[in-house]
């Protein structure tokens, strides 16, 4: 390995895994229990990226606009619990790895890079997803939404990786599909790759000014 980078970090949803179908199904299953309207998948896409609480908050705001119905705090907490239940039961029913993800991760691991996952996804769901696609063994660290006091776009997860592995920020390359990924990386002093195929609230990743922009996950091999 002859690279300035020693560790490569990855977002999960929209970067490694296309989890939108299962997330949308779980959101709508929870909404249905409270007789709220069903959201189209392309709309749920714009709600992803800031963790489960904000995802459900956006869903409820939309449902209120559509139906005029609002939930009490207790009902909102119950709906969040139901979403978590449905998603735990449907983590990988329809979700798939994006093209070239597994092969590229294996190559990077063989080349000696430390690999890590940094996601805002609920921590308890992260390992089951990685295991379902048989890539969990490739990562030396996995950080979810409850692993640390702060989540992306805060740089704390990347600072944590620096401390754990004894690295400087410039030795970390972070790969993601949303502005939160790019903001977190740049705030920490890390280099950022933006992927065009992910979610990012339906906005071009170029608007967030990553250091590189790729359409294919395998293109990472060109810069390391």
Swiss-Prot record:
Pathway: Organic acid metabolism; glycolate biosynthesis; glycolate from 2-phosphoglycolate: step 1/1
Lineage: Bacteria, Pseudomonadati, Pseudomonadota, Gammaproteobacteria, Pasteurellales
GO CC terms, sorted: cytosol
Record-level Gene Ontology MF annotations: metal ion binding; phosphoglycolate phosphatase activity
Domain of life: Bacteria
HAMAP family (UniProt xref): GPH_hydrolase_bact (MF_00495)
CDD domains, per the entry: HAD_PGPase
Annotated GO biological process: carbohydrate metabolic process; DNA repair; glycolate biosynthetic process
Name of this chain's protein: Phosphoglycolate phosphatase
Record's function text: Specifically catalyzes the dephosphorylation of 2-phosphoglycolate. Is involved in the dissimilation of the intracellular 2-phosphoglycolate formed during the DNA repair of 3'-phosphoglycolate ends, a major class of DNA lesions induced by oxidative stress.
UniProt-annotated catalytic positions: 11
